[in-house]
Amino acid sequence: MLLRSAGKLNVGTKKEDGESTAPTPRPKVLRCKCHHHCPEDSVNNICSTDGYCFTMIEEDDSGLPVVTSGCLGLEGSDFQCRDTPIPHQRRSIECCTERNECNKDLHPTLPPLKNRDFVDGPIHHRALLISVTVCSLLLVLIILFCYFRYKRQETRPRYSIGLEQDETYIPPGESLRDLIEQSQSSGSGSGLPLLVQRTIAKQIQMVKQIGKGRYGEVWMGKWRGEKVAVKVFFTTEEASWFRETEIYQTVLMRHENILGFIAADIKGTGSWTQLYLITDYHENGSLYDYLKSTTLDAKSMLKLAYSSVSGLCHLHTEIFSTQGKPAIAHRDLKSKNILVKKNGTCCIADLGLAVKFISDTNEVDIPPNTRVGTKRYMPPEVLDESLNRNHFQSYIMADMYSFGLILWEVARRCVSGGIVEEYQLPYHDLVPSDPSYEDMREIVCIKKLRPSFPNRWSSDECLRQMGKLMTECWAHNPASRLTALRVKKTLAKMSESQDIKL
């Protein structure tokens, strides 16, 4: 009989339970052909054994097949004929006891080639070496590319917008006023088309920084020779940028007393992202800056007050039409967020905290923003956390409290009888320069104090009426405060009574 083995080849007969066993050889001497495995006493390449004859094929170190044959002793031959595989070595053995020199007829073959058989081969070593070298070179090139690109960006001005001469969407000679008028007459009323906004953003040249706040920086820039203001938001203030852009592009939002919106864009420069909001430029700056350096007469005071409340009234008013405008509350009114134009009128800016009222669903649309308003201008219901956040009118009345404080700032700078007070912030004499919630809560909610009036106001009719107006704006009870429309009408009557044309 033949006993064949290649890898884990079963040798012998099977028992009833399926287990393979080696047959018990006959107790006689068996002669076998031997090659490369001949003992010293062999004659004519013949050896003798009481076990098995075998023939084996295996692969040498160079990968060539080598055939050997010989005798296996009875002891341990069962295990040897099973030929337990050796890792990374190709080998096959066949055994027999049928007759003398029976292994002449055995022709074992190498087991099929497996990928792992080449792990230690010289060809694989060369391939591995080449692969590692190529990958290392590519990695070095990528690192060098990234490094030089980073250094190139570092050498550029921090806030420069690439001047890509893309005139496809903006014909030469078109001014910003032309573009805005065209969008109002033929568009949706929600601002310039997005593609035009992006083109303007690409073509702006940044000139100088003119301001800095908690949200980012303000730059004066130029587009085709026209001055514009570019508000550059910190990446942490993306929610404010998104909200302000959204509010400015609300249908029918444009108004002479709301800061004129031009464009918004996100500029990626590799190592950082810049959020741009481009608006009209007003060289007088904020009302806060203007009042610090400028004194007023009755006409200029009323002009500042009337134009400011006109912008606020437009914000607060819902417009019903096929393309209507929702009512909007500012939520961060202060003199630093109102700008002064060349003609002495004001416009309201910084709408990053604004809240909208959706009348169709009776829903208050509050921005997902961690930023809060300015503590000095917060009304009592915000300071003591009693404001009803689900009632839009609560936000409107909170704005009116803040506006009353702004009127006080303006009126103090109006000259009467040759006397004028220096500019001061509201509650300057009652709280520190950077008050805490507790500071403001104690003064506004607990002690119920408000900014004091100079004695001279009582002898000047215009200032006396202004004092009465602001008192009704900052009343402790929100329901008792005047609306923006009522303040606007009152200021118009005051101007008319003094023959002042606004």
UniProtKB/Swiss-Prot annotation:
Residues 1-13 form the signal peptide. Keywords: ATP-binding, Cell membrane, Chondrogenesis, Disease variant, Disulfide bond, Dwarfism, Kinase, Magnesium, Manganese, Membrane, Metal-binding, Nucleotide-binding, Receptor, Serine/threonine-protein kinase, Signal, Transferase, Transmembrane, Transmembrane helix. Residues 149-502 are cytoplasmic. Residues 174-203 form the GS domain. Interacts with high affinity with GDF5; positively regulates chondrocyte differentiation. Interacts with SCUBE3. Interacts with TSC22D1/TSC-22. Interacts with TGFBR3. Belongs to the protein kinase superfamily. TKL Ser/Thr protein kinase family. TGFB receptor subfamily. It is linked to Acromesomelic dysplasia 3: A form of acromesomelic dysplasia, a skeletal disorder characterized by short stature, very short limbs and hand/foot malformations. The severity of limb abnormalities increases from proximal to distal with profoundly affected hands and feet showing brachydactyly and/or rudimentary fingers (knob-like fingers). AMD3 is an autosomal recessive form characterized by bilateral aplasia of the fibula, severe brachydactyly, and fusion of carpal and tarsal bones. Brachydactyly A2: A form of brachydactyly. Brachydactyly defines a group of inherited malformations characterized by shortening of the digits due to abnormal development of the phalanges and/or the metacarpals. In brachydactyly type A2 shortening of the middle phalanges is confined to the index finger and the second toe, all other digits being more or less normal. Because of a rhomboid or triangular shape of the affected middle phalanx, the end of the second finger usually deviates radially. This is Bone morphogenetic protein receptor type-1B.
